[in-house]
Amino acid sequence: MSYVYLLECTDKSTYVGATMDLDRRLRQHNKEISGGAHATSIKVAEGHAWERVCHITGFPDWKTALQFEWAFKFHSRKFAKKMYPLERRMRGLRILMGLLRSTSKSILYETYPSGGPTIVWESEEARTIYESII
């Protein structure tokens, strides 16, 4: 199964990625095991840690998950950099979930065997921000 996930660092920065193993990937980002993105390892070296805020599931294949990941990052970058990072990500996710598909070349959400992407919340703060966005 493929997932797109959102991490938040103890310094409040955020990171969006895609994986097939959520727990292993978080351990990699926190340098508990080898692997992980360079951007997240810098924060860990500075004494910070990463926590998963939410993940999105229901993708029919890896390609579709990667398209969603790209679009999540793209839509999040439309907002001012001085905005609280988690709010920027939630606004981007809200836009993305309101579309018919994640990119112009991806398949329609309604054609996913699961019925479309589903957000699994792991942070009440993130869920509250997401639900407050109209």
Regions found by a protein language model. Name each.
Residues 1-3, 48:
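Residues that flank catalytic or metal-binding motifs in active/ligand-binding sites
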Residues 2, 12, 26, 35, ...:
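Generic intrinsically disordered, low-complexity segments enriched for polar/acidic and small residues
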Residues 3-9, 13-21, 25, 29, ...:
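GIY-YIG nuclease signature motif recognition
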Residues 10, 24, 45, 63-65, ...:
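Alpha-helical structural elements
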Residues 17, 35-36, 47, 58, ...:
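Residue-identity detector for glycine
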Residues 22-66, 71-87:
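Conserved short loop/helix modules at catalytic or binding sites
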Residues 69, 73-134:
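Boundary/linker segments flanking structured domains
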